[in-house]
């Protein structure tokens, strides 16, 4: 931590227990096996443009999306989970909900970038730091029989409590063909995280992940616990309205925190309205980490230094974001949802 503070003077140690709700182990070592797919190269281009728009750490840079990408992110020969722990300790993050990168639409549905099994092995190395968040999709191509079997196995035999649904590679959030998945998740008492808002990177389809579609799901499965990633941006208002009257809908700030520097007013409006409609106890923090360690730095500093502008408090009635609220968003809200003990810090 001392080395981190020296390199980044604005970064100082704090006492917030932090859990990253969205941390991808994206199979960096595997990408050389499928980077020839044109759809993968479109994804790389989209990722770079998203990083530029958010003012986050750029990962891939290429002048022509058809060309093989070059990587400017921090290089490491370490296993992804080992490098992740270095980042967690460097930036004072206690735990991370790790999820595999499916992205089968980028490989012609021939392979996933990383798998649930790989993440289970990674978590065995750091059981007090890593929480496995399996991705059971794509639901439609797999079929419900296999999806439900794996859901039961991972929940009951491997104690997984958080499951990711990535609509852009699959189908609409409210596709009734996947109702059996929601029903079984509700029965098991597990939480479902869902990518909401925009797809961000081709060839994923944005129409599949519109927050308004959640309304059908939570009306039919009122007790199902859902974490909506990315605050539903740019359809934040629709997500806030869904959360307003459905007490088991949580809003994740993953991806958007770098706007504390690049677009502070926009971020303040997103956070202020989410708290106003869902309540501070249903807002959770995350990075949307996919490789660059700087994403942790930006997400930590972004929330830690955040203050609700007085003008927005006056114009919209937004509440001040107190230290207690930040503590909940950083970790204790998600800890209560997943049954995590926060009495002792885990970041070294």
What are these regions (language model features)?
Residues 22, 88, 96, 119, ...:
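Divalent metal-coordination and catalytic microenvironments
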Residues 35, 72-73, 105-113, 201-208, ...:
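Short, flexible/disordered intra-domain loops and linkers
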Residues 1-19, 30-88, 95, 279-282, ...:
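Mid-to-C-terminal alpha-helical segments outside catalytic/metal-binding sites
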Residues 78-84, 114-121, 146-150, 210-214, ...:
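Alpha-helical scaffolding within the catalytic cores
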Residues 22-30, 195, 230:
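Histidine-centered divalent metal-coordination motifs
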Residues 19-23, 126, 217:
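A generic "structured core" feature
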